[in-house]
């Protein structure tokens, strides 16, 4: 049984590919031995596609035991069928069942290693890499001397000396020892005998590999017959990269060189251990997504087959009979698998091999693998089966085109082309690349074809999940019509494919004209070999494998394949492969053009005989070279090609003999042909109908016209004299250009030389040269056989290198020349074809160097390979990354720290191409669970510094977001929230990008949302209208490093359509997704073009727009609420990884999804006593600034922290985050802090209350529960109050910083927005977000009331009443609006609302309550009456007249009829109980006194209910005042679940801070401490009516802050928070905000730092000053400089910042580089000639560190601040005299610099080449200033009063502005606008995009005195810095 399965596998993997390799028996032997020695089931073994090794499916446990040197039987894959196992062994399959993996088994036959191997070891060049130039030269000299001596000896001395043969050892022993040294482990004996025990007695059982660049070995095994090396499975090789993913290596020579570098390292290690690498190919270099390469040795090259074994192989091949059917029938000579493609093509063209065999060979060359569902061989469908033997298909069109039609393909191409243009080339989205065809044979089609033979489970997994057997095509006719893909070989060879193994699926029916499956297969095969197919098959080859796959021909034929044009960079092992780039020659199916006999020359006199002989015609059948019958074809005149001169007087006998000779079967002339009348131009004329007669001429032979011309020669119809030459040219052109082949020369027998190890090493180097050339000419060498001998590969690539030398990259030309001797002596190389011989002999000394070796090529002093200087450091970095296995956080930190120590050496010399190699490793570290935080902390700053802001945002933003959103709690997580790290983020990302994209994720930690992974999933899109605000899964939603394979789409990060770059980076791909598009769930979703606001960025994109009603309300409110207006598009623009499939109003789905919100919160609730305690201390430590002195009792009363690591970490984390937010709020200033920090915090506040768990009351650990602890009114905060503590703390700190207006102008409008009822939705519409928003609104209002002054409170009291209290009460008392969390949420809201109303009552007094709060109080109490009336009516509602969907109505005592939802009555009764009546009536009767009768009409009813509650209490309860405490939570300024942690001195907390008994207030003595944790939460409470600090409890003063808003600052802030973030225009209102006096001379230049918290100014007083930009005062205050730099000797005319190193550059004729933090001078650059001073300076943008300087002699110089001396020096003026350089500007990319001269001339220079791109007279006057903008735009101003906008390489300006009176001498840029300034003190704003129009404002003397000299704009803050000639700088808005 095992033998049969083995034989079956061999046939499937090797034979069915159309060729049985000569090593087939060898590989069968390897399969047999592996099964026996390794105990692996034969079903789980398969030959690798190249036939070099065996792939095995093994269990991970078996592999683990093998690594431990224990070899047991490998478990069988019991749960998998044979077909499934066969599929899992295919290369394109990446997903394996749990617990299974694949390995590679490489074997060496011991009997073939019996030859002796010379002991001569290589020279010492590889023993140690030369470290100095002297050492390198010494090594070279010594090797040259030895080589020359030995060469002379071998040439002249050895023939005459009778020396003994060199010492040698058996190759087996040498190889065994070398393998053990290389792989660091010993051989494990396996099999029946233990003969090899003696060879492994010493050495470690397992060690480290000699070189990490070598593919590691899992184990070395030895049996009596074999040596085995077991490798991990190689998923991708370099061959896959160059074949299927060539875009991964495009535009980067460094990547190719780095692969070569690592290969050389591996080869060097092997050579030093005495092991040759073998005949390597691209398949032997394993690569991963990061292009990290590892070398896999070719051990089979060591085997030397003997002659008797060769004979055995051929006999075995004959016995198996594979040749007759699989190798191609009737094929003469040796197996074509060993021939070069040239012979194969010629054999097919001349009919010596069958169509089937030839097509299978092409499939094999393309890498297609039998049985691989993604990459199975393809053959054409040739007929449609509708008629007997079918109608032939048009092979000039692809099957996809025939099925879909031209219109469909044109539409697909045009649509994808438009999307491609709109999205930008290289946008990374393959679906939007213009194409016609997606695939030639998809895996689904493959399984449909083989559905009858494939297990049901496989079909359900790949075709359709639900088993529908009758949905599969039932007949061959239906199959051919249905599929757009090509056919598979099984329909031509395998009759069993029609037979179904499924009982409910019928067999696949063959056409009616066939009686059996076998007959159909035979007929189908005959059709494939028919003459009709043969004559057009070359067209199909061109479409499938040839030149019509790419270029104009592909577009013309509608054959553009997606895989070939999408420029994908992910690795894949299948796709469409182009073999030929020239038209394929046609098969010569008719008579040859040059036959042995000449054609008949017809004359008038032989006409009767011709007619007679025509009757003797016999139809013949063509027998092609494969020995199969072809459809009937008859010969015609075009087949008669032999020409014999015949005179006009020749007799009839000669003509008759000629005619008779051509119709005799068996002669050369009997091959059929055809008339050329039906042949296409340029095709062979063999397509006439089979019924034509060869001897008969048509009437169109020209006889009529030539009857009178006796001597005229008339050629036969269709005969072309040059036809044979044309055919020869076509074939020759294809062979030369397409195949690069040449005439084969006879081999000369050569004696077998002895095998020297040194020769093997030379052979390795030659193999390396061949391999490099194959990588360069990957598209041209696909025509070579996969198992072509090395000498064939060498000759092919050497010819390519000679003919196409310009295609070789410059960096590889020297190494290819050295390795392959391309430019050697004129005498041709003698190529040796032995298996162990070098291809040729290297010269002893070539160009002064010895023969190449890995060590020589790796030497930094060798010029053969130009390896960059950073390669060794980068290689060391990657080795360290690969060597460490990180299993916990400690190891993760150690690894990152070690990498950080090495990173400096890498980045010092690295280039952008090197960063492309390094960056995927950094991104991988930032995406791994145990290293993400530490990678961000240690590596972000140096890597971002090298990348620059643009690339940092592109590549590092997504992993940064993932690190912040990752739910895992790590010890070092707080590092990400330190102010120093956030400062780095601001600097490296840019302030605007940080605020928009990253800040919302940073702030999430305050709300605790990041701690709940389940919540993050549950909040993803409960309804469609909530998708913009609920959390969406980002990198933190799944395990770190987990590849999301579903659909092949990388998980988009939250809020941003950011691609995943871990698989590769290319800086050349700069066409990113435009800002107007977002990548969402694989589709483009249109979005507003402005920068995405924080509202649309992740967490809940936690905005408050939780329903359609709220969104519409936001639109109505506009900017009034202090939040940005919500536009309808933004609701749909949130990035989500889920499809937009939730429908609006689907409350059932909403409830189900919200149910999973709080899975982790329940666990948090169980440890409330631990984690909340730590939270309390954190919150209070934050608030010590807000309320100084109030926390003095905290340390005394504080409980010791529980000894739980998680609690401590959470405390540290929140402490750090709150501290960072306080620092950031001050750093950003009032407007930016309000727009970005405060708004995000307000949104987060709502998320703190989402879900039922966060609405549960909590119990503090130090409380002994009262008697009624089970009561829902137990006085304790809800969990949401605990979670929201840090958020409230930060919100109040912002209010403390900037004053009371923050509370009234920003917080209160947002509260109104939260509680506003929806206008467009049904009254019952209340979701979990809205519910949480109500709780958050009431909680925040409690905080606000405490900190408001009396005057302010009275001013806004009507707003609070109408916009907060009444809307909340409308939800709370509604009979039709249900709460998602039921009675619990309504109870919490009720309790909080009572506390809020009571707090306001205490603040304003009884009279004001009656005047302003009577309506809210009455509304609240009225609900008791309504419920009482419904209870008295027995809940009988008026159901009459209620149509379906309408609610019944009830009539109440006030005469009004109101709708009532019967399902909500129970919920309301649970809330408004007797206890609730008692709880609210007693305190309000105390607070309101007698006016309660006027305000509350039903006070008597509520009083009765309260009395009933008192009566229901037991006497014991009445005696215990504590148990009678109403436990209504109340709002206070600060709260904490821990007793004594409150900011107030009072520790008591009753309903309102004390126990209320009857109508008096009683302070209980029995409770020295609060019995509940609400002491500091409860509003009124917290000592609200206590005897201590009563004023502080009800009212707190906001401490005065130096940054408090007043005057102009307040007016500007009020305006600014109402402006939409989507407004891209700059508005100048001339509001004076601050003054900066100090300079004693005119201010010449002003420049803001990138973080916008400081700015620099340079002046005539020879100083540069650094000023802070923090707000002070009311707009009239003056600010002193933070630092003064006074090292200049002249007037300073330029100051700027080098962004990458954060240095300041200033110039006064000499350039000074200094540190802005210390003022220390770092470098001074003086002009080379004092008579030629510097006139203009510009700094290069990050990541560049260069300074550009222009001198008065029109010379441009570049200086790198890190290195001494000049970098470059370019002359700008040329032959002209343009004057002095007045201004310089560098493009944002740093690729060009533009200089403006005093003559108005401008010059554009390429900084990379130094070439002048353009010079033009731009202005008529002096150039005053130039600035460069993104998009190759230049803006220049001149003394001719003009401001002009240019495109870099366009002649005419795009816009031209003219100032009427004064020139624009200074300007700055704001987005697409220019802000200008003139000497007349006028500020103007004009657009770069719209037609010329300018808004101008004259500066008033009150706001600005003096003359404007300089201007700078703060883009994020929207401020202007204006410098004047009096030395004062002013900040205006």
Swiss-Prot record:
One Pfam family named in its UniProt record: WD40
Gene Ontology molecular function: K63-linked polyubiquitin modification-dependent protein binding; phosphatidylinositol 3-kinase inhibitor activity; phosphatidylinositol 3-kinase regulator activity
Keywords: Cytoplasm, Cytoplasmic vesicle, Endosome, Lysosome, Membrane, Mitochondrion, Repeat, Transit peptide, WD repeat
Subcellular location per the Swiss-Prot or TrEMBL entry: Early endosome membrane; Late endosome membrane; Lysosome membrane; Cytoplasmic vesicle, Autophagosome membrane
Keyword Chloroplast (UniProt): no
WD repeat segments: 1638-1677, 1684-1724, 1776-1815, 1818-1856, 1903-1933
Family matches, as SMART domains: Beach (SM01026), WD40 (SM00320)
Gene Ontology CC: autophagosome membrane; cytosol; early endosome membrane; endosome membrane; late endosome membrane; lysosomal membrane; mitochondrion
Complex formation: Interacts with WDR91; involved in early to late endosome cargo transport. Interacts with BECN1; negatively regulates the PI3 kinase/PI3K activity associated with endosomal membranes. Interacts with SQSTM1; the interaction is direct and regulates the interaction of SQSTM1 with ubiquitinated proteins. Interacts with MAP1LC3C; recruits MAP1LC3C to ubiquitinated protein aggregates in the aggrephagy process.
UniProt protein name: WD repeat-containing protein 81
């Amino acid at each position: 049984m095992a033998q049969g399965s083995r034989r079956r596998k061999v046939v499937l993997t090797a034979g069915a590919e159309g060729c049985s390799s000569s090593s087939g028996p060898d590989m069968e032997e390897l399969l047999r031995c592996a099964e026996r020695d390794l105990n692996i089931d034969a079903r789980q073994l398969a030959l690798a596609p190249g036939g070099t090794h065996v792939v095995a499916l093994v269990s991970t446990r078996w592999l683990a035991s093998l690594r431990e040197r224990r070899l047991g039987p490998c478990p069988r894959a019991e749960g998998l069928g044979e077909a499934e196992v066969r599929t899992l062994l295919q290369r394109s399959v990446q997903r394996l069942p749990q617990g299974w993996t694949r390995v590679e088994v490489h074997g060496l036959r011991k009997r073939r290693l019996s030859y002796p191997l010379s002991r001569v070891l290589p020279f010492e060049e590889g023993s140690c890499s030369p470290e100095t130039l002297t050492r390198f030269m010494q090594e070279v000299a010594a090797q040259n001397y030895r080589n020359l001596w030995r060469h002379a000896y071998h040439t002249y001395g050895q023939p005459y000396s009778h020396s003994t043969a060199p010492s040698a050892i058996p190759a087996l022993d040498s190889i065994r020892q070398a393998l053990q040294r290389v792989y660091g482990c010993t051989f494990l004996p396996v099999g029946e005998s233990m003969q090899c025990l003696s060879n492994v007695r010493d050495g470690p059982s397992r060690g480290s590999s000699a070189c990490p660049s070598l593919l590691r070995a899992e184990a070395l095994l030895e049996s009596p017959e074999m040596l085995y090396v077991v490798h991990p499975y190689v998923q991708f090789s370099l061959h896959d990269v160059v074949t299927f993913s060539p875009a991964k290596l495009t535009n980067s020579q460094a990547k190719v060189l780095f692969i070569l570098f690592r290969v050389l390292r591996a080869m060097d290690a092997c050579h030093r251990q005495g092991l040759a690498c073998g005949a390597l190919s691209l398949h032997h270099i394993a690569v991963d997504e990061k292009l990290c390469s590892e070398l896999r040795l070719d051990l089979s090259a060591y085997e030397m087959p003997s002659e008797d074994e060769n004979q055995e192989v051929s006999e075995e091949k004959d016995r198996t009979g594979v040749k007759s059917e699989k190798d191609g029938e009737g094929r003469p000579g040796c197996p074509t698998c060993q021939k070069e493609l040239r012979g194969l093509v010629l054999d097919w063209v001349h009919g010596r091999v069958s169509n089937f065999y030839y097509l299978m060979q092409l499939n094999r060359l393309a890498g297609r693998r039998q049985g691989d569902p993604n990459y199975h061989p393809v053959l054409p469908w040739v007929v449609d089966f509708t008629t007997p033997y079918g109608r032939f298909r048009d092979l000039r069109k692809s099957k996809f085109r025939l099925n879909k039609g031209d219109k469909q393909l044109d539409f697909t191409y045009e649509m994808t082309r438009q999307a491609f243009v709109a999205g930008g080339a290289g946008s990374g989205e393959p679906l939007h690349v213009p194409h016609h065809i997606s695939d030639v044979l998809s895996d689904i089609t493959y399984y449909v074809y083989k559905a009858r033979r494939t297990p049901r489970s496989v079909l359900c997994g790949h075709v359709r999940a639900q088993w529908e057997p009758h949905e599969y095509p039932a007949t061959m006719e239906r199959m051919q019509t249905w599929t757009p893909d090509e056919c598979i070989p099984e329909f031509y060879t395998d009759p069993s494919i029609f037979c179904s193994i499924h009982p409910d699926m019928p067999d696949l029916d063959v056409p009616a004209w066939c009686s059996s499956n076998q007959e159909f297969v035979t007929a189908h095969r005959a059709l494939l070999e028919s003459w009709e197919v043969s004559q057009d098959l070359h067209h199909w080859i061109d479409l499938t494998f040839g030149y019509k796959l790419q270029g104009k021909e592909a577009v013309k034929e509608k054959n553009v394949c997606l895989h070939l044009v999408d420029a994908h960079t992910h690795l894949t092992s299948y796709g469409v492969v182009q073999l030929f780039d020239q038209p394929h020659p046609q098969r010569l199916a008719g008579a040859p053009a040059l036959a042995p006999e000449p054609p008949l020359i017809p004359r008038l006199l032989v006409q009767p005989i011709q007619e007679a002989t025509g009757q003797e015609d016999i139809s013949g059948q063509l027998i092609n070279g494969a020995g199969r019958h072809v459809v009937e074809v008859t010969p015609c005149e075009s087949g008669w090609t032999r020409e014999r001169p015949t005179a006009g007087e020749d007799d009839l006998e000669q003509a008759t003999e000629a005619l008779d000779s051509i119709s005799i079967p068996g002669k050369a002339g009997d091959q059929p042909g055809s008339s050329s009348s039906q042949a296409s131009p340029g095709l062979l004329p063999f397509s006439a109908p089979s019924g034509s007669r060869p001897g008969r001429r048509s009437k169109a032979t020209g006889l009529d016209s030539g009857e009178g011309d006796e001597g005229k020669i008339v050629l036969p119809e269709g005969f072309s004299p040059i036809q044979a030459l044309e055919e020869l040219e076509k074939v020759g052109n294809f062979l030369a250009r397409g195949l690069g082949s040449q005439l084969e020369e006879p081999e000369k027998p050569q004696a077998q030389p002895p095998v020297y190890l040194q020769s093997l090493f030379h052979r390795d180097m030659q193999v390396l040269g061949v391999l490099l050339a194959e990588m360069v000419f990957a598209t041209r060498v696909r025509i070579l056989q996969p198992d072509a001998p090395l000498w064939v590969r060498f000759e092919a690539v050497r010819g390519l290198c000679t003919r196409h030398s310009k295609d070789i990259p410059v960096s590889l030309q020297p190494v290819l020349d050295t390795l392959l001797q391309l430019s050697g002596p004129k005498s041709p190389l003698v190529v040796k074809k032995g298996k162990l011989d070098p291809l040729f002999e290297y010269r002893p000394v070539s160009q002064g160097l010895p023969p190449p070796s890995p060590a020589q090529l790796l030497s930094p002093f060798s010029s053969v390979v130009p390896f960059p200087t950073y390669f060794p450091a980068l290689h060391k970095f990657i080795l360290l990354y690969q060597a460490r296995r990180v299993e916990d956080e400690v190891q993760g930190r150690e690894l990152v720290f070690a990498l950080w120590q090495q990173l400096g050496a890498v980045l010092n010399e690295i280039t952008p191409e090197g960063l492309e190699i390094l960056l995927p490793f950094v991104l991988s570290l930032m995406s791994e669970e145990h290293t993400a935080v530490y990678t961000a902390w240690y590596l972000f700053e140096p890597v971002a510094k090298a990348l620059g802001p643009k690339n940092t945002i592109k590549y590092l933003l997504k992993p940064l977001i993932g690190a912040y959103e990752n739910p895992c709690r790590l010890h070092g997580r707080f590092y990400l929230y330190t102010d120093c790290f956030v400062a780095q983020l601001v600097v490296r990302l840019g302030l605007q990008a940080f605020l928009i994209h990253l800040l919302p994720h940073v702030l999430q930690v305050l709300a605790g949302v990041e701690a709940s992974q389940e919540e993050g999933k549950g909040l993803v899109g409960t309804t469609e209208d909530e998708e913009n605000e609920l959390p969406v899964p980002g990198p933190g939603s799944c395990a770190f490093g987990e590849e999301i394979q579903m659909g092949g789409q990388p998980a988009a990060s939250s809020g941003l359509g950011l691609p995943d770059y871990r698989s590769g980076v290319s800086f050349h791909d700069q066409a990113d997704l435009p800002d107007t598009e977002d990548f969402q769930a694989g589709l483009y979703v249109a979005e507003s073009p402005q920068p995405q606001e924080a509202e649309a960025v992740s967490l809940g994109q936690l905005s408050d727009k939780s329903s359609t009603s709220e969104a519409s309300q936001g639109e109505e409110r506009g900017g009034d609420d202090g939040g940005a207006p919500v536009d309808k598009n933004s609701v749909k623009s949130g990035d989500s990884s889920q499809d937009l499939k939730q429908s609006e109003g689907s409350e059932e789905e909403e409830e189900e999804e919200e149910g999973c919100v709080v899975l982790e919160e329940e666990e948090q609730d169980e440890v409330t006593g631990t984690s909340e305690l730590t939270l309390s201390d954190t919150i209070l430590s934050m608030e010590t600034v807000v309320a100084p002195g109030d926390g003095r009792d905290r340390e005394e009363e504080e409980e010791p922290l529980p000894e739980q690591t998680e609690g401590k970490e959470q405390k540290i984390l929140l402490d750090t985050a709150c501290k960072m937010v306080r620092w950031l709020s001050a750093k950003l200033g009032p407007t930016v802090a309000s727009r970005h920090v405060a708004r995000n915090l307000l949104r987060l506040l709502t998320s703190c209350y989402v879900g039922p768990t966060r609405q549960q009351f909590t119990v503090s650990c130090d409380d002994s529960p009262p008697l009624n602890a089970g009561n829902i009114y137990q006085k304790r905060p809800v969990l949401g109050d605990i979670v929201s503590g840090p958020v409230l703390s930060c919100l109040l700190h912002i209010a403390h910083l900037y004053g009371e207006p923050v509370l009234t102008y920003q917080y209160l409008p947002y509260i109104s927005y939260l509680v506003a009822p929806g206008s467009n939705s049904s009254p019952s519409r209340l979701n979990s977000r809205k519910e949480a928003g109500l709780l958050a609104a009431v909680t925040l209002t409690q905080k606000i009331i405490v900190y408001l002054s009396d005057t302010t409170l009275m001013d806004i009291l009507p707003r609070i009443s109408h916009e907060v209290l009444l809307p909340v009460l409308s939800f709370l008392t509604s009979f039709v609006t249900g709460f998602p969390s039921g009675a619990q949420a309504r109870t919490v809201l009720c309790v909080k609302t009572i506390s809020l109303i009571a707090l306001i009552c205490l603040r304003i007094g009884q009279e004001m309550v009656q005047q302003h709060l009577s309506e809210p109080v009455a509304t609240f109490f009225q609900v008791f009456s309504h419920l009482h009336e419904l209870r008295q009516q027995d809940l009988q509602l008026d159901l009459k007249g209620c149509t379906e969907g309408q609610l019944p109505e009830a009539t109440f005592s006030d005469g009004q009829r109101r709708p009532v939802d019967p399902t909500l009555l129970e919920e309301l009764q649970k809330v408004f109980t007797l206890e609730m009546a008692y709880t609210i009536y007693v305190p309000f009767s105390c607070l309101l006194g007698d006016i309660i009768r006027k305000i509350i009409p039903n006070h008597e009813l509520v009083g009765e209910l309260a009395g009933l509650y008192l009566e229901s209490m037991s006497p014991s309860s009445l005696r215990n005042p504590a148990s009678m405490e109403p436990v209504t939570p109340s709002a206070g300024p600060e709260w904490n679940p821990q007793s004594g942690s409150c900011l107030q001195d009072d520790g008591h907390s009753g309903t309102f801070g004390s126990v209320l008994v009857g109508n008096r207030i009683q302070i209980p003595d029995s409770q020295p401490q609060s019995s509940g944790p609400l002491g500091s939460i409860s509003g009124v409470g917290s000592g609200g009516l206590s005897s201590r600090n009563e004023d502080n409890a009800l009212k707190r003063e906001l401490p005065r802050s130096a940054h408090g808003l007043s005057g102009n600052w307040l007016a500007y802030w009020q305006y600014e928070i109402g402006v939409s973030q989507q407004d891209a225009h700059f508005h100048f209102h001339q509001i004076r905000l601050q003054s900066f006096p100090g300079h004693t001379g005119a201010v010449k230049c002003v420049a803001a730092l990138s973080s916008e918290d400081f700015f620099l100014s340079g002046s005539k007083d020879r100083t540069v000053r650094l000023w802070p930009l923090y707000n002070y005062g009311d707009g009239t205050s003056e600010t002193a400089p933070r630092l003064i730099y006074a090292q200049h000797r002249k007037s300073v005319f330029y100051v700027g910042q080098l962004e990458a190193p954060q240095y300041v550059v200033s110039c006064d004729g000499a350039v000074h580089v200094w540190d802005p933090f210390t003022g220390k001078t770092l470098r001074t650059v003086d002009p080379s000639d004092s008579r030629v001073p510097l006139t203009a300076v510009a700094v290069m943008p990050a990541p560049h560190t260069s300074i550009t300087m222009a001198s008065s002699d029109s010379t441009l110089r570049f200086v790198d601040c890190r290195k001494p001396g000049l970098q470059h020096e370019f002359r700008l003026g040329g032959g002209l005299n343009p004057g002095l350089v007045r201004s310089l500007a560098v493009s944002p990319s740093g690729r060009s610099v533009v200089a403006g001269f005093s003559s108005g001339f401008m010059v554009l220079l390429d900084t990379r080449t130094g070439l002048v791109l353009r010079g033009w007279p731009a202005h008529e006057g002096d150039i005053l200033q130039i600035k460069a903008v993104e998009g190759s735009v230049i803006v220049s101003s001149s003394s001719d009063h003009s401001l002009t906008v240019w495109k870099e390489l366009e002649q005419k300006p795009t816009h031209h502005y003219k100032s009427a009176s004064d020139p624009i001498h200074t300007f700055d840029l704001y987005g697409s606008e220019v802000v200008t300034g003139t000497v007349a003190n006028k500020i103007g704003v004009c657009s770069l995009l719209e037609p010329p129009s300018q808004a101008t404002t004259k500066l008033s003397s009150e706001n600005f005195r003096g003359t404007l000299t300089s201007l700078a704009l703060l883009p994020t803050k929207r401020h202007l810095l204006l410098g004047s000639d009096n030395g004062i700088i002013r900040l205006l808005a």
